[in-house]
């Protein structure tokens, strides 16, 4: 941030949707539509299906890694921590209807909380019941670990990479 300011240029954080477009929408809302921002809740949910018994929405290794750590949110002017799937919330959304979501950590929470420190900033992601169940079993069995293990045949494998290969 300091280097960007010193250079007199504007840096774009993320080129995707979240972070990226979400940050631009927040700034647009601040500049054009709202007198005060007290909370920012980003809801990432869809009604899609992969037609498979189980699938992730994007690269399984990245997807699982994102959800095995601590969930951070910015609330009441301070960082709050939770475990994945600890804080549920149902949203009733246009087009997709009622969908269960869980508070999840995500990159834009950090950038938005820096600009809107007075606001609660949370990220919610939709997961179906099957996803939550499969994720929980894989995690409890140690299959989402990035630490190598040695098989009975003496081969060293990383459980998370094996799960990814199987999906």
Residue ranges: model-predicted function:
Residues 32-167:
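C-terminal catalytic/substrate-binding lobe primarily of soluble NAD(P)-dependent oxidoreductases
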Residues 9, 14-15, 45, 76:
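Fold-independent oxyanion-binding glycine-rich loops
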Residues 12-25, 30:
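Short alpha-helices
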Residues 1, 18-21, 43-50:
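Short gly/pro/ser/thr-enriched loop/turn and capping motifs at secondary-structure boundaries
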Residues 1-11:
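Rossmann-fold NAD(P)-binding glycine/threonine-rich loop
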